[in-house]
Amino acid sequence: MDLHQKIRTLPTSPGVYLYKNAEGEIIYVGKAKNLRSRVGSYFVRGADENSKTGSLLREAVDVEYIVVDNEKEALALENNLIKQKKPRFNILLRDDKTYPYIKLTMGEKWPRVYVTRRLKKDGSEYYGPFFPANLAYRVVDLIHRNFLVPSCYIDLRRYHPRPCLQHYIGRCLGPCVEGLTNEVQYGEAVKDVKLFLEGRHSDLKQSLTARMNKAAEGMQFELAAKYRDLITTVEDLHQKQRIAAAEGDDADVFGYHYENHMVAVNLFHMRGGKVLDRRDFFFEDLGEMEATGGLNTGEFFSTLLQQIYLDNKYVPRTIYVPVEFEDREALCEILSEQMHRKIDINVPQRGDKRSLIDLVAQNAKQSYDQRFRVMRPQTDVLKSVLQDTLELPELPNRIECFDISHIQGAETVASMVVWEDGKMKKSDYRKFIIKTVQGVDDFASMREVVTRRYKRIVEENQPMPSLVLIDGGVGQLHAAAGALEAIGITNQPLASIAKREEIIYVHGREDEPIRIDHHSPVLHIIQLIRDEAHRFAITFHRKRREIRDRSNELLEIPGIGEQAMKRLLRHFGSIQSIRTANATSLEAVVNRTQAEAILAHFRAEETTRS
């Protein structure tokens, strides 16, 4: 059953649909109130005029679907699948900053508090995010002073002979030394910290008051005084929060600017009626979000809000967005259930709130100009900045970048792409079939391709590039460096860019990784070169697999050996051309018996399909 036939059989229920390419890879995930209607809309006249949607339709060979009970379930499932599968044609959130959380290590006998920007499934409890960032550190300092739960990295699985300075100055209970505290006392302190971080001030005050009274009854007046002071501190903090809340509710406000197939989004975080921080998001590949008439703003903001807020630890009571979108009420319900309180997503049309959205949109335009106009400087300036950032001995007039591609060690290939004087120089691209490596060994594969490339350069007395760039981490970088040294090339500028973290390692300074600002044109150009090497390697690898698969199919035909297979592929170019060829065309390449066998094979295949 072909794709069009399959779409006509889709149910009219709500659900999620998944487009797949020839390799079975999920390339787009979408949600729908009516699966048949939504998926069918891709194929109406004019739908593929948009280059992005057209690319999706040209690559998609299959569609799968998951039926759910309602729109709310479809929205949640779509978000989970996008985060899990990261489909190429969906917009994927790439934030330019991460906010700190406070981590309470409940998996330890003696839990501690830390400020962290990474959320892990390690049994710890996380509170936040906090912005501005220094607020998290101020809260932890308050915990040290009032609850005496530490942030140290001492091994608490064993006792030590003496406590550190923090215990002596009254900022730690001293669980590292036997006898200074016990599990009951420490457990009460941790419970207090949890109540404090969860904002349960009444429960915390009640617990502290009970302990204060008990201490007073036991004639422990110094301890009772400590509890009294702590109760006063908790009341003061609670009062300040109530005043801030009265001055203005917590809210997030969105604005955007769309131009030339690119979008800048600004998000203002308002807490207590004041703007405490802002975030920028930039999108250059909008995929299915960009319809023929421009940006599908409703679907864009629906997806954006899902990726920002679903599964987040904190969602403000009100979110203001500039446009209406279809599943706004469903998203409100999900977020309200997630936070155990009512969450509103509003689309103001007039008044102060609309003026606020317009203000955020003006900031988004400035961010757009800064990112897409100002920060795309002239080539010479860019090369100079790149030279300074990586501390290169000369201007990087030519960069050669390598990437390895395989699936579980099969059909391993490599690519080399070239950036020269501000442009990708496709005429100098090279493809390599890895010959000496068996199985999965990216390091050995990198050594082979670098050796082959630059051994030839040396033999032909050609100049080396200004920079050799490797797609990978420190391991791949060392493999490339070892290959160059083995053929007598020293002092060659060499760097690598690690995936996901986008950290740059320079050979000889691996212990000083370079973290470049996300808005920097230097990072953009390195990412562009790296992504092009990856694309080129993936494309070559797919073609190799297709050739292998075609070869296997032809070799299954009785009487067709390797020589006949090679002649057929060389003459017709593709399996599809062979499949549609007539007897006369086939007999120009193979004998009559072989031609008849080929015709019979594809005739039987067609009968099976129908």
Curated annotation (Swiss-Prot):
Molecular function terms, GO-annotated: DNA binding; excinuclease ABC activity
Source organism superkingdom: Bacteria
Location in or out of the cell: Cytoplasm
GO biological process: nucleotide-excision repair; SOS response
Pfam families tied to this protein: GIY-YIG, HHH_5, UVR, UvrC_RNaseH, UvrC_RNaseH_dom
Keyword DNA damage: yes
SUPFAM superfamilies named in the record: C-terminal UvrC-binding domain of UvrB, GIY-YIG endonuclease, RuvA domain 2-like
Keywords on record: Cytoplasm, DNA damage, DNA excision, DNA repair, Excision nuclease, SOS response
Domain UVR positions: 202-237
GO cellular-component term (any): excinuclease repair complex
Keyword presence, DNA damage: yes
Every GIY-YIG domain range: 12-91
Subunit and interaction comment: Interacts with UvrB in an incision complex.
UniProt record similarity statement: Belongs to the UvrC family.
Name of the protein in its database record: UvrABC system protein C
Lineage: Bacteria, Pseudomonadati, Acidobacteriota, Terriglobia, Terriglobales
Gene that encodes it: uvrC
